């Protein structure tokens, strides 16, 4: 058991924490777990990303999978830090449209919390710049969703705090 907290350091909750490194490890964890919550890098306030039974920390699923240098579209695993995106792509002339108050938020956490930055009044929140997401749902299926395909799941997931499945 590990003791976890959010960014505010309170409350501290004892939980079993698993940190998968691959899709196959994640699927195995999900198949054998009834009660869990996904967690990014723990930068949410409060205890929103902690479950007393099982917390699945996604920070090791942190790979860039594809990048289009013309459009700037990035496909990445949910554990990638915004800091890594900035460090990798700023030298190429690209910067995320929306960043949170800390660059140590994961991509999945930014989606799950639908973070906003100082430009919220102009550009909106992080979810405005997400083209599609793959979700591990409660049936242990991987479902791709977008504004046009499985759109309800897409909109429920952006800002859904991890309750629709694991990004």
Task: Give names to the regions the model predicted.
Residues 2-6:
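N-terminal regions that are enriched for targeting/export leaders
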Residues 8-101, 113-119:
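Glycine-rich N-terminal segment of FAD-binding domains in flavoprotein oxidoreductases
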Residues 50, 58, 99, 105, ...:
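A short, structural micro-pattern
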Residues 69, 106, 137:
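Short, acidic, Ser/Thr-enriched surface-loop or helix-capping motifs
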Residues 110-167:
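FAD-binding subdomain of flavoenzyme oxidoreductases
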């Amino acid at each position: 058991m590990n003791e976890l907290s959010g960014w505010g350091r309170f409350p501290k909750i004892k939980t079993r924490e698993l940190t998968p490194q691959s899709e196959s490890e994640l699927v195995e964890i999900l198949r054998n777990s009834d009660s869990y919550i996904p967690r990014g890098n723990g930068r949410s306030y409060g205890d929103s990303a902690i479950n007393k039974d099982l917390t699945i920390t996604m920070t090791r699923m942190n790979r860039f999978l594809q990048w289009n240098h013309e459009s700037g579209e990035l496909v990445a695993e949910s554990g990638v830090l915004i800091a890594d995106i900035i460090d990798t792509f700023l030298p190429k002339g690209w910067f995320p449209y929306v960043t949170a108050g800390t660059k140590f938020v994961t991509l999945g956490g930014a989606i799950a919390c639908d973070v906003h930055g100082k430009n919220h009044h102009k550009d909106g929140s992080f979810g405005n710049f997400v083209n599609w997401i793959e979700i591990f749902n409660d049936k242990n299926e991987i479902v791709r969703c977008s504004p046009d395909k499985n759109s309800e799941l897409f909109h429920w997931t952006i800002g859904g705090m991890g309750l629709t499945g694991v990004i």
